[in-house]
Amino acid sequence: DGPPPELSDHSATPIHTAKTHQDTPFETIGKGIPSQTQWEVSGKALVTDVPITYLGYVNRDTGVIEEPGHPLDGVPIKDAVLIYPKGSGSTVAPFVLMGLIYTGFGPIAIVNRDVCPLTLPAASLLGVPYAHGFRDDPTTQVNTGDEVSLTLSGGEVSLRVEARSTED
């Protein structure tokens, strides 16, 4: 009884980001995790200074971030060196990330500003290079599209921007 509800397009309020495009050389040192002793990886960076919520906001089938208002909304994480401050949300997040990695829709490496108990288990169990605790904040110093290299040796991770992107 009564008229059907009217659905309108409620565009999400953009989540605040402090990221600005960087163009100076950048290299920093961080930490690895005990389950990983040595690795080298390079690739294109996908960067945000806003936490990522895997459960409900990263499509489990495609790896595309689907969080209206998030700076990376609509962007796939597949084959990226994924750089973000930390995960957020449920303790189910590692299982979502593990599924993405297992099916080939996950990142090739994960860099967190802070050690992340929602991200670390998936990276550790499936052998995805994981780094955290950098001297300088990679979420503000690396641009999406930068070519980066990471090397873990002796528990220390070196992150270096090899080539800067021309746009963010």
What residue spans do the PLM features occupy?
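Feature captures the catalytic cores and cofactor-binding loops of soluble hydro-lyases/lyases
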Residues: P25-V41, L46-E156
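Intrinsically disordered, low-complexity terminal tails and inter-domain linkers enriched
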Residues: P3-P25, A163-E167
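Generic recognition of long tandem-repeat/solenoid scaffolds
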Residues: G155-A163
